[in-house]
Amino acid sequence: GTAPQELARQRARYCAALEQFELYFGPGRQVQVYSAPGRAELGGNHTDHQHGYGLAAAVTLDLVAVAARNTDGYVRVKSRGFNKLDVIDLATAEPQEGESTHSASLIRGIAEGFRTAGKAIGGFDAYTASDVLRGSGLSSSAAFEMGMACIWNGEYACGLDARAQAGISHYAQYTYYVKPSAQLDQLAS
């Protein structure tokens, strides 16, 4: 669409995400808005996790997260289009049985990655709305992972650069989600 049409669409999208956050987590909270893009592989598809080269670029489709810190040691994430509210107790660091291949495993793994990096983190509540559709080939999982990493990095002033956040996100995907991969997707997101 035209620039004014796209601006109106994005404004409505962000406002809807804020409204949904308030619906699930209550009004009047101090929130921040985070964005993590999907990615397109321009060359070397699947060669990156075979120790080869790949080329990727971020795309304009992204995951938007409205988030606020909490003090109870839990992470709660509600994602548009999914019926489940992910609730993760940060006191439990190790991978949980039955959790791999679910978003909760990524959140738990990213938390452990931040702790391993020596960063003090805590809980948060978040609502996510993603235009990076599952199965689209644009790495919705990397957008989700990087969105979660951005929330911890921002809410808890961790000071990690994008490359370090990508490394943590990759660790979570490989170790907790149990999906062998390289860092191409996370680095592009």
Where are these regions (language model features)?
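ATP-binding N-lobe of GHMP and related small-molecule kinases
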Residues: G1-A142, M146-A162, I168, A172-Y177, ...
